[in-house]
Amino acid sequence: MTEVYLGIDTSCYTTSLFFMDRQGEKVAEARRILKVKPGGCGLQQSEMLYQHIRNLPELMEEAAQGHEFSLLGIGVSAKPRPREDSYMPAFLAGQGFARSLAALYHIPLWQISHQENHLEAAMWSAKGPEADRFLFLHASGGTTDLLLAEKMAGVAAEKNVNEAATTEKKSGEVAAATKNKKVAGNYTLKEIGCSLDLHAGQFVDRVGVALGLGFPAGPALEQLAAQHTEILEIPVSVHKTEVSFSGPCTKVLRMIEQGNFAGEEKDSDITQVIATTEQAAATVQTATVTQQHYSAANIAAGVQWGLAETFVRMIRNAAKEYNCNDVLLAGGVASNQWIRNLIIEKLAKRQIRVWLPENRYSGDNAAGCAAYARRQSENQGII
């Protein structure tokens, strides 16, 4: 019989389970993307909750097949972000499932936020950063946050763990968090940057659906962009560590609505910035174009370029202001390989080290919940 910690995450579009052993290695996992009708742009919370409730027992059967588990503890995402005012019904499915198992087997239950789950999963997979202080970029459909993570030392870290355990034993909640600074495991997280309007994933999904792709559109957009012949540079809006995707998204959607893509014959007299793949990583040339037709692939590549350039400027500004040379990336948008490569290339010129989890642990998963439960339980000597 294998002793394991169970991680559970029921986000907006994925149901996830993860089993981790005492050595911190994966034993089994199962996840399922929620179904969205073709042409749809999302799900209502009631539909998310319904699908999660149906998925959880089926995924448990799938993950447990061929194994005999002895549960030591459970970690679950209970809300979107580590804030007192953070709430989303979708997480009630996983939270209720976790509480029932914990009560039945009399084992510790650790409740964290979906964002903390991303942090924990990314650190577990990337095996770092090792620095006591680093930047954390969480870019997904529901979040575009840049945070400063600082390791708590000695007595402060021990006090935090004990307080969290006491709080959870009494009320099943994570340690209290303020608006801009919160506790994640043995780290404090300070919000230092964000999107002022659309999140990165919303930008991707809106353009993807307009191009006829399914929802969520991230993986399909990346595949489409791989067919590009040139990269359309879209506007980038960054002020220090605050960014905006609303303007760039509107511009791209207008181009699609006007039909200036996919080989359609339509004259236009507009000025655009165009770059080849190599130029996108270095110098971009400006050209006035007549009779310009943008393929869907070139538009998709332009969206990727705009996201990567936005993240690079955001991280670069924060690294300078907070004197940090390490950044950890997580979130569905951050799993895009082309975006990753461009970020690494550009930040390397500034001696900023980029830490990347495996793609499957950048998007929604439950590995972080399991890793958190394992560390907290064993640090306290509960098991």
Predicted segments with their positions:
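A short helix-loop
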Residues: 3, 10-11, 18, 27-29, ...
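N-terminal phosphate-binding loop and adjacent alpha-helix
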Residues: 35-67
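Phosphate/pyrophosphate-binding loops at sites that engage ATP/ADP/AMP, CoA/4′-phosphopantetheine
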Residues: 59-72, 314-324
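Short beta-strand-loop/turn "lid" adjacent to the catalytic site in phosphate-handling enzymes
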Residues: 61-98
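Conserved phosphate-binding catalytic cores of ATP/NTP-utilizing and phosphoryl-transfer enzymes
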Residues: 107-135, 372-373
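Glycine-rich phosphate-binding/hydrolytic loop that grips phosphoryl groups
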Residues: 118-121, 357-383
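Glycine-rich phosphate-binding loops at beta-strand->alpha-helix junctions
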Residues: 324-343
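Conserved phosphate-binding/catalytic loops in two-lobed NTP-binding clefts
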Residues: 326-327, 343-369
